[in-house]
Amino acid sequence: MSIQFNQVSYIYQQGTPYEFEAIKNVSLTLEQGKYYAIIGQTGSGKSTLIQHLNALLKPTTGSVNINGLEVTNKTKDKHLRHIRKEVGIVFQFPESQLFEDSVEKEIEFGPKNFNMNLKNVKDKAFQLLLELGFSRNVMSSSPFQMSGGQMRKIAIVSILAMDPQVIILDEPTAGLDPNSKHQVMSLIKKIQIEENKTIILVSHDMDDVARYSDEVVVMNKGTIVEKSNPRNLFSQKTQLLKWHIELPKVVKLQKDIEKKYNMLFPKLATNEEEFVKLYKEWHHEK
């Protein structure tokens, strides 16, 4: 399932003194099965962009082609039902949207609206919850007797269990403890690889962006200013400073060592394991 933006602009409160153009003439292609990260300063247009991915917002000008359906400002909502099933969005702090008195009912809510097979959805949700460290009686438990991190995981699983082809995650690990963060991000990566899902991650955590994504889209003032793989992107230190984007911790460490010893590693590490391997190879040859 591919998604293509064709010269898309979106204006909030158009025609009023408060109108604001949040994204400007954006053209972008997102391919099936890839893991994308969308990064940029607060206010750069990231949230507006992702709301076009399942037509929660429609372009003011331009069009978005979602799996063959051309969405413009004239597209009727009745044509968008299938898209909203296939493109799942996990918004920031999704635990605030939980309202059912059991995990099972919470999992069932979305699928009922799409007339999905509830047994299949619940079976998938149960397996995902076990992978995230829940006990086997989780489905009968109340989300409101759980920690904030556990509620976040349940909210995320409620989207994943509907088996969307495209999974959009807006700051999914903000505020989670390191163990929960690792569980969630590892599960998402596993789903991408094993089920050929398209993942779109919006994040200010450059460590996650470097480790998990295949391609990174950089937004600045409503436009796309760069689309590259993490290794190439995080090699552009001067340009990243201009866009107010920090380097991942592992990249900072590598740069510091290269500067201290006046040397260069053969490539830029995008995660700790890769850095350790490069460092050992260099230290052995030294």
UniProtKB/Swiss-Prot annotation:
One CC-aspect GO term: ATP-binding cassette (ABC) transporter complex
InterPro entries assigned to the protein according to its UniProt record, in alphabetical order: AAA+_ATPase, ABC_transporter-like_ATP-bd, ABC_transporter-like_CS, ABC_transpr_CbiO/EcfA_su, ECF_ABC_transporter_ATP-bd, EcfA2, P-loop_NTPase
Keyword Translocase: yes
Keywords, in A-Z order: ATP-binding, Cell membrane, Membrane, Nucleotide-binding, Translocase, Transport
GO molecular function: ATP binding; ATP hydrolysis activity; ATPase-coupled transmembrane transporter activity
E.C. no: 7.-.-.-
Main location class: membrane
Record-annotated ABC transporter domain positions: 3-246
Membrane topology note: Peripheral membrane protein
Assembly mode: Forms a stable energy-coupling factor (ECF) transporter complex composed of 2 membrane-embedded substrate-binding proteins (S component), 2 ATP-binding proteins (A component) and 2 transmembrane proteins (T component).
PANTHER family with a match to the protein in the record: ENERGY-COUPLING FACTOR TRANSPORTER ATP-BINDING PROTEIN ECFA2, HEAVY METAL TRANSPORTER
Protein name, as recorded: Energy-coupling factor transporter ATP-binding protein EcfA2
